A protein has these predicted regions:
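Conserved glycine-rich beta-strand-loop-beta hairpin in the small C-terminal domain of fold type I
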Residues: 69, 85-95, 105-118, 152-154
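Conserved core segment of the aminotransferase class I/II
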Residues: 9-85, 95-98, 176-180, 194-195
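Conserved PLP phosphate-binding loop immediately N-terminal to the Schiff-base lysine helix
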Residues: 1-7
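Short, conserved charged micro-motifs
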Residues: 122-128, 166-169
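PLP-dependent enzyme catalytic core of the Aspartate aminotransferase-like
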Residues: 132-141, 147-204
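Short, solvent-exposed loop/turn elements at beta->coil junctions and helix N-caps
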Residues: 22-23, 102-103, 144-148
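Short, conserved active-site loop motifs that form the nucleotide-linked donor/cofactor pocket
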Residues: 16, 103, 139
């Protein structure tokens, strides 16, 4: 969110493979069209990826291809600036309101995910814990074990994007500070989810 992050490609471009796509770069969840940028020095890897891809993927659907043309041919700096400002504000809101002596969580510096750790001795696995959270709060989290963490580590992946991004964007400009009132107005489900998670964790 600080816009000062340097990619490893700035230091070692000849050995850096960049992968990205519409769903992450544009915040267009489910619009799966991705690509690799591979330096000439790694042509052998590029050739192997081409072989694997040709045997693995079918063609991208036509609507996504047309969306990609628009996404990549126009200047979207205003859209990106607004997106970053919204995600930064909402992410920091979730961090500030969820952290406690029972929830360890790092402040987000980019993206739209958090990985809180819920300190408790009630559950044996993070999967069991996430099922309990879903059943008792209606909040859906993915267990840390899905991302390679030990099952007994009570981690969960949380996405803070359950809001209408277009409506949010239409009601702010690049200079407007996004405060708690705006988050309550345009991201009410996120606010509700945080409150439910906080109450759940406090009653463990």
């Amino acid at each position: 969110f600080s816009k000062n992050v340097k990619s490893i490609s700035s230091y070692c471009p000849e050995k850096t493979i960049i992968s990205t796509g519409l769903s992450k770069w544009c915040g267009a969840g489910g619009w799966r069209l991705g690509y690799f940028i591979i330096p000439d020095e790694l042509n052998n890897i590029k050739n192997m990826i081409n072989v694997l891809a040709s045997e693995t993927f079918s063609a991208v659907s036509a609507p996504i291809q047309y969306a990609a043309i628009k996404a990549y041919e126009n200047d979207h700096s205003n859209y990106i600036t607004k997106s970053v400002n919204i995600l930064s504000a909402v992410g920091k809101y979730v961090f500030s309101n969820l952290k406690s002596n029972k929830v360890l969580i790092n402040e987000p510096h980019g993206g739209f995910y958090l990985m809180p750790e819920f300190l408790n001795n009630k559950f044996k696995t993070s999967s069991e814990m996430c099922k309990d959270i879903l059943n008792n709060t209606g909040v859906a989290l993915l267990p840390g074990s899905d991302f390679g963490f030990n099952p007994d580590k009570m981690l969960a992946r949380l996405s803070f994007t359950d809001f209408d991004g277009q409506e949010f964007m239409n009601n702010i400009d690049e200079t407007k500070k996004i405060d708690e009132n705006l988050i309550n107005k345009f991201a009410p489900k996120v606010v509700e989810g945080v409150n439910k998670l906080k109450n759940w964790s406090e009653n463990l």
